[in-house]
């Protein structure tokens, strides 16, 4: 909460949530925090922190649904401003925004500002990733960065390379970037370095590459997020030239010799 007080959500800790003023601001149930509309002039901001190997859903008072992926932070106010609805994201989240043309919905990341009135889209913006992605599934989106505005239509993706600051707009299959919220990992020609980052946030492990060429190997496929780490390793080793060796909380990755 705004004063630093933390409330842990779990299946054993369900029930009402109150803010610093003692006002009931939501209900925690079934891995979802349902926010309630309240009347307050303070407009305090709360932060939802999703741990590594976790995921959570947030339903805002306006009806907007947010699916937060592991290792993500979402900052949102108890009460939205009269002319706009603003939240802040660090990590990855899927947004199903309630339509309200008079009060646009804005997501701020460390790199960009994404503005919509009602739509479905995914944002990936982890601090330790070398990129930021905005993938549009339905509706329309405007991505603003350093004064420049990029408009997306369904099936289009905004990709920012943080190092070079190059921006690429491309046609993609949105399901490849949104299926995580439905319990699936999907990858299409993804290099092993970026794939390992996604996997490490889910299994709470660290990957160590024995050689640079292993990082550049690419993988296409899908598997259930409920799969164990052992099952994931078996899938990868049976479909790629990569070998995994688990030592404690670290997975060493190498390429098989031919």
Stretch-by-stretch model annotation:
Residues 1-258:
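A residue-level detector for the "anchor" residue at the start of short, highly conserved motifs
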